[in-house]
């Protein structure tokens, strides 16, 4: 009896042990990632600057990145105004100086976030409307037309700047931002990056098609820009682009703009001012989205997210580079000769971080709610659909008058033919 009891106990013990092993092998239920105020992996925060030599290199990277938009906007607008290469150089120097000064003020006295204040694409539409105004068509001299147009743009920007100052100092924008929830911030920040998709790969494909680690992430721009720039210089010097179309030469040649060889009282109109003030609301939302993204990450959008360095010292050094190269135009013109496809390839990387910063706000939302899903889906869909409507409208395939136009479907889209 004793032996039987002992065997039974052993069997029971063995069975019990088997049951415990089965419970240990049971798959654990998946748990959501915990919400963190700051993402891990940041090596230098706002108040922990890197060494001076490293900060100078990182600041120069930010200068190169901001140089892309600083050169692209004058390259689009100055020829429409009647200006040449010399006028384009002056506009680029002015944009660099103002961007550097604004960045310094913002880093010392403003929000003090590691953010570079640069030009915005939102003002291109109202500026273009001023350029094509009928009151400037009577000037036959291109230089005089450029001067008159620039004075009107300056006057509109002065009124718009005063308007933005009043909106911010009176607390109007502070009260508006107070109602922004994580659900409303997510599409705002996301499309701050996605809204600039047209300056990414569409510009990269105009150029020639040609070690993983922490240092490659941090100094990626310093490694890739000189190599690709030298390659573009070799192609330009060897005459590869001499017989290419003009659009290819404009995008790829290092001497395309003549910047290096050409490096020396506003008017006010109520119509221009109102158009510019409408664009200022867009920039207010754009700046708010970037500041939210920067504060959420604990590092700046774009390049700061890639380098994992969110120090104010880096941004202030970058602003110093802007001021220096805007005063000494020959140096600035040298770096401004970087081909646009090189800068566009950088935008393909850094704008991804801007968009992902907006999506990170969704972790604070209840995605199981149908109201949340509808608001999120509606915001994303309309942010894509409305610009597409205006794009088709200005291309002549949008709204049609049925009394005068017969609409036919050709299998690829709407085609409007005269009846």
Curated annotation (Swiss-Prot):
Regions of compositional bias (Gly residues) in chain numbering:
1-22
Looking at the UniProt entry, the stretches that span the membrane are: 64-84, 91-111, 113-133, 153-173, 184-204, 220-240, 273-293, 313-333, 334-354, 370-390
| Places the protein is found | Membrane
Q: Which GO terms describe its cellular component?
A: membrane
The record gives the membrane topology as: Multi-pass membrane protein
Keyword Protease found? no
Q: What is this protein called?
A: Putative nucleobase-ascorbate transporter 9
